[in-house]
């Protein structure tokens, strides 16, 4: 009976919405011009993959059976402006809102060293556009590789567990591989110039950092699973020296920000459809007013997005496909350090929803 429960536990739960899977966190933009890049990965152990034992009968070489490759996709358009939690509805009426559109692709690798330990790597690729109405105005288009991450992950208990639950901890190093000063054509004082694009569409931040993350799952009753994921990207650097074309004191260069993501909920298998799971949960992502380490000067748009996070996941053979559609229920553009010093409160544009899809292949 216990062995059957273990199999059921490993075939249940759906997570995700993002990029980089195999139980590992990557970076990706949040739903708006906050420029948060946190995201989460599939708990592959819960859909029949992710452990060495699960592939022990395959014909692939032993070293290849340790490998999982994941490809993620994320898209959203931000256009609703908020100051604090108050939407600036006049922006849409006056047709002067800023629109950001972002496509984010992600390739992640999880290589299992043992039942508990894995090596993680992630390469994000971003394609973004921004219709900026204030000077220097124009439609900016920026694309390229983002900031790569490499790290390790460990499960607290050796998989598979008889208790139908487990907790994983991971740490990753963020490499400054993405450009942070991408430029586009713009108009300033009637002249066409080449200007640095807004930091919300820059692929990287030109800074070293590190991410600490955790994820957990637990079967409760009627084959229902609870899940939780959380990650925090620590960026100790203060500013990166890239100009913003802003004139207020403390806002002339870009700030290098921490970023975070927390999500949790439950998952349940669809009756009479094997390996199909539906999930419902909540998520919170954004950037803080002040970083955990170092100063928090320069221009940033701190705030957060709280979303309802429905999704589905289907596993077949060595593949797992996951689709999520987080829908924002609360958006808050908080005051930054420079806002507080200047006695002001800037705004930020947010999206209503995000489309996230991930395909994972376990060799």
Where are these regions (language model features)?
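Transmembrane beta-barrel strands of outer-membrane/channel proteins
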Residues: 69-77, 121-125, 169-175, 212, ...
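Residue-level signature of outer-membrane beta-barrel architecture
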Residues: 73-75, 111, 123, 154-156, ...
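Surface-exposed strand-loop-strand hairpins of Gram-negative outer-membrane beta-barrel proteins
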Residues: 40-47, 75-104, 200-201
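Outer membrane beta-barrel transmembrane domains
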Residues: 80-93, 233, 238-363
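Outer-membrane pore/translocation modules
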Residues: 127-255
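Long, hydrophobic/aromatic-enriched structural stretches that serve as scaffold segments
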Residues: 25, 94-155
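Short loop/turn motifs that connect adjacent beta-strands in outer-membrane beta-barrel proteins
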Residues: 31-34, 57-66, 80, 99, ...
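Residues that define the transmembrane beta-barrel architecture of outer-membrane proteins
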Residues: 65, 99-105, 142-148, 165, ...
């Amino acid at each position: 009976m216990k062995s059957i429960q273990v199999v059921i536990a490993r075939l249940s739960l759906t997570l995700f919405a993002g990029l980089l899977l195999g139980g590992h966190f990557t970076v990706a933009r949040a739903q708006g011009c906050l420029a948060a890049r946190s995201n989460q990965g599939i708990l592959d152990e819960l859909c029949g993959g992710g452990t060495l034992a699960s592939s022990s009968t395959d014909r692939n070489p032993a070293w290849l059976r340790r490998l999982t490759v994941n490809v993620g996709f994320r898209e959203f358009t931000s256009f609703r402006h908020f100051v604090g939690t108050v939407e600036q509805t006049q922006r849409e009426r006056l047709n002067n809102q800023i629109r950001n559109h972002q496509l984010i692709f992600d390739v992640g690798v999880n290589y299992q060293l043992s039942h508990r330990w894995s090596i993680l790597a992630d390469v994000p690729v971003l394609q973004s556009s921004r219709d900026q109405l204030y000077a220097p105005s124009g439609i900016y288009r920026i694309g390229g590789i983002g900031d790569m991450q490499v790290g390790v992950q460990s499960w607290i208990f050796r998989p598979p567990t008889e208790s139908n639950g487990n907790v994983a901890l991971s740490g990753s190093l963020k490499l400054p591989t993405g450009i942070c000063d991408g430029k586009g054509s713009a108009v300033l004082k009637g002249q066409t110039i080449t200007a640095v694009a807004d930091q919300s569409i820059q692929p990287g931040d030109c800074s070293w950092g590190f991410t600490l993350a955790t994820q957990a799952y637990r079967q409760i009753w009627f084959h229902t699973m609870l899940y939780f994921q959380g990650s925090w990207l620590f960026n100790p650097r203060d500013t990166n020296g890239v100009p913003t074309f802003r004139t207020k004191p403390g806002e002339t260069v870009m700030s290098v920000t921490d970023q975070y993501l927390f999500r949790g909920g439950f998952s349940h298998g669809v009756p009479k459809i094997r390996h199909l799971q539906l999930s419902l949960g909540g998520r919170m992502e954004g950037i803080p007013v002040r970083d955990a380490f170092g100063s928090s000067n320069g221009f940033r748009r701190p705030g957060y997005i709280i979303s309802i996070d429905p999704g589905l996941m289907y596993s077949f053979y060595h593949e797992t496909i996951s689709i999520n559609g987080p829908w924002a229920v609360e958006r808050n553009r908080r005051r930054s350090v420079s806002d507080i010093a200047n006695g002001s409160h800037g705004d930020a544009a947010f999206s209503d929803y995000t489309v996230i899809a991930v395909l994972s292949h376990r060799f």
